[in-house]
A protein has these predicted regions:
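Short S/T/G/P-rich N-terminal loop/turn motif that feeds into the first structured element of a domain
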Residues: 1-70, 93-95
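C-terminal structural segments of small proteins and small subunits
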Residues: 62-90
Length: 95
């Protein structure tokens, strides 16, 4: 069952965000993840418009997604992430 991590974020420091993306991106790929979408252009089709940037990452299954999120390689990126942006990560399991 494919798993998607949806990261919603508000950038606090663009330089730190670039450094975070450079550090974190390879950890996703090393754990079998694939970037599906990254963007900040938002238009509400129904309901309230939320102005957040998003990144959507696909993993083969939820176990691999969780392994990536708790991996030492990604955990090392946490200080950069916290300086770069306010983030929320949500894991979705698809059928």
């Amino acid at each position: 069952m494919t798993a998607l991590i949806v990261a919603r974020f508000d950038i606090k420091n663009a330089d730190k965000m670039d450094a975070y993306a450079t550090a974190a991106g390879p950890t996703v790929l090393a754990h079998g993840g694939e970037f599906v979408a990254i963007g900040d252009k938002v238009s509400a089709l129904l309901g309230n418009e939320e102005k957040h940037s998003i990144a959507i990452v696909s993993f083969p299954d939820a176990a691999k997604a969780k392994t990536w999120f708790t991996s030492p390689e990604y955990t090392a990126c946490k200080p950069l992430r916290e300086e770069a942006a306010e983030m929320q990560f949500t894991l979705y399991e698809t059928e």
